[in-house]
Amino acid sequence: MSIQSGEILETVKMVADQNFDVRTITIGIDLHDCISTDIDVLNQNIYNKITTVGKDLVATAKYLSAKYGVPIVNQRISVTPIAQIAAASKADSYVSVAQTLDKAAKAIGVSFIGGFSALVQKGMSPSDEVLIRSIPEAMKTTDIVCSSINVGSTRAGINMDAVKLAGETIKRTAEITPEGFGCAKIVVFCNAVEDNPFMAGAFHGSGEADAVINVGVSGPGVVKAALENSDATTLTEVAEVVKKTAFKITRVGELIGREASKMLNIPFGILDLSLAPTPAVGDSVARILEEMGLSVCGTHGTTAALALLNDAVKKGGMMASSAVGGLSGAFIPVSEDEGMIAAAEAGVLTLDKLEAMTAVCSVGLDMIAVPGDTPAHTISGIIADEAAIGMINSKTTAVRIIPVTGKTVGDSVEFGGLLGYAPVMPVKEGSCEVFVNRGGRIPAPVQSMKN
């Protein structure tokens, strides 16, 4: 890869003035060779493999950050879904495995570890059910472990028994963790991807190599600055500006990923192009949409503006790298985006509008705080709606929702750090309890007739 001096100067400006960073270098680690019928042996095997494969990740990230002057905010680990790895143990709880993941991740100094996961889009094995029922206690007794459940796919349909259990699991987690914070580390997916470097939904897919490096970049501030400084008038020209900017962002991520791969002697997997916001001013996806001409994110036209942004980011990124993967789009996490927070506080950005926006962007209803008395079946209904959008449109969708115990609409909750804070948003008054309790499976959609 040849780098021009002009690109270097642009990168310096992106970092210094526009909040550009490499959000994460994530090592995916396969744990199939750790399987044992004895859960204590399994835990020791898991600890040994993670601490062996990942031991140099943090030092490498610090070296590359200093060498290139680009912040690398997080170093993370993702592992094979634990429901698959722990099944042979026949244990009635996998909380000890979560605690082992937590201990191993802390030992090597990473920010988060993902993969306390179950893939149940077509049905639940006994091990899958044990894992899902272990999630609340696992989130309570660990600090940096992230969990995910894949409840549907375009090919399998939606497993409504799993959707019901997921809603109950989130509700229980909210009740036993301070201000529901444990729920910030749980994602429920439809069409989950196997090479996602971002938390909380990262896991290492069964089709992946023994270890792989996946990189996530972040540059909402860079895109907004490019639009501010351009003379684009039509939306066609806006799309072109975004596309060219995404190309530049992606080139930096590609460089960091391939350098990390060489230093760690681990294959380079993918570069995730997702625009991932932070609560910092100037690092917001919502403000990009407003720069396009919306008075406030969430008003009419927001979904169209987001569709333009998402598509232009993908087009620009694909020209800059042959290893684009993961989720690759725009994230819209309410609590992690100061523009989204402001729009939600103003009452313009609602749960319904966010649901519509997820039909055209990366992932889905993300980091949304709802009243603590929200029933489990309502959470399951929200998950089912989001999964349906993903299933029908052949895309990844997800829900990361936090029922905040003791809080109601109008209150707010502080999560801190990259997770930010969120206003508590209202949910519908009507009940979907009978619908959710029916269980079964929503069949996979027909593919030949698309309307």
From Swiss-Prot:
Pfam families tied to this protein: DUF711
Name the SUPFAM superfamilies for this protein. PFL-like glycyl radical enzymes
Q: Which family does it belong to?
A: Belongs to the UPF0210 family.
Gene3D superfamilies noted in UniProt: 3.20.70.20
What name is this protein filed under?
Answer: UPF0210 protein NMC1568
Quaternary context: Homodimer.
Query: Taxonomically, which superkingdom?
Result: Bacteria
CDD domains assigned to the protein according to its UniProt record, in alphabetical order: RNR_PFL_like_DUF711
Q: Organism, per UniProt? A: Neisseria meningitidis serogroup C / serotype 2a (strain ATCC 700532 / DSM 15464 / FAM18)
